Amino acid sequence: MVPLMAVYWLVYDRESQSTAAQAQITAGWGGAQVLTGPVLVLPYVANVTRTETINGQDRTSVVRERRELFVAPSTQRIETTIAPDRKGYAIYESVVYDSAMSGTARFDWPAELARLDVDPASVLADQAQLRFGVSDPRGLKDGARVEVGGTALALQPGNGPAATGGAGFSAFLDWTARQPLAVAWRYGVRG
């Protein structure tokens, strides 16, 4: 007869070793991935009224505050290829993948800025930004490229959308023309 605690300990030990083995296998691949974007971010300046109490007196002031308006693409097409593979470590096995993503998106100038309480004159269109989210950037592969109107943009790490905890990559662009924006992109992820 085997004591119940010995069985419990054996199961716990194997689970711990399995978790450690999976971490070892996927160390160079990146973990589970959440991918988002592209999202176009338009910064703007808003006048915000603030009231604070100083020595029992209410004081109201108007402060200029920088905010961000997130614009989703009006149309988007995405193509993804995924090549799964099994990697092993001792008696443990884990599935990893290598993926390639490409797509196009079209952004139109937001027509309802007034409804969103955004003054069109306060939009800093010359500081617009495209953001792509990759939750575990260790898995990003070389060769990422983002083009607007056929011109490649300089990519920067980080500053992804909130859905990926700010992880990912981004690119600044000038949208002062306020004409439809054609974006093409491609990048690869391992996970």
What residue spans do the PLM features occupy?
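Hydrophobic alpha-helical transmembrane signal-anchor segments
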Residues: 1-13
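Elongated amphipathic alpha-helical scaffolds of membrane-associated proteins involved in membrane
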Residues: 4, 29-36
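Short, well-ordered alpha-helical packing segments
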Residues: 7-8, 22-26
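Soluble non-transmembrane domains of integral membrane proteins
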Residues: 16, 20, 27-28, 37, ...
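Short, structured protein-protein interaction patches enriched in aromatics and acidic/basic residues
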Residues: 44, 48-49
